């Protein structure tokens, strides 16, 4: 099964997440199929907090990929 989820990056106490399409069995930060965007929860100033390639996200959703709860919330906030 394919899932769209967040993969953590960044430094200690400075999280930065990549929105990735991955096999459900792979590790959180492990191998992924495609990167769809990023989420920066502590963006400051002129930094972009969220970027998603919605065209590719819609493709993966049409192929049966299941978004995690947090990614589904991010999709809603990005499209609004």
From Swiss-Prot:
It holds the Pfam family Ribosomal_S16. Keywords: Ribonucleoprotein, Ribosomal protein. Belongs to the bacterial ribosomal protein bS16 family. One of its GO terms (biological process) is translation. SUPFAM superfamilies: Ribosomal protein S16 (SSF54565). Signal peptide: none annotated. This is Small ribosomal subunit protein bS16. The gene is rpsP. GO terms for molecular function: structural constituent of ribosome. One of its GO terms (cellular component) is small ribosomal subunit.
């Amino acid at each position: 099964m394919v899932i769209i989820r967040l993969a953590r990056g960044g430094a200690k106490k400075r999280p930065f997440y990549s929105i990735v399409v991955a096999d459900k069995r792979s590790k959180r930060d492990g191998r992924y199929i495609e990167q769809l965007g990023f989420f920066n929860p502590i963006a400051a100033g002129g930094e972009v907090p969220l970027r998603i390639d919605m065209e590719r996200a819609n493709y993966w959703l049409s192929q049966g990929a299941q978004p995690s709860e947090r990614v589904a919330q991010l999709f809603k906030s990005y499209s609004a």
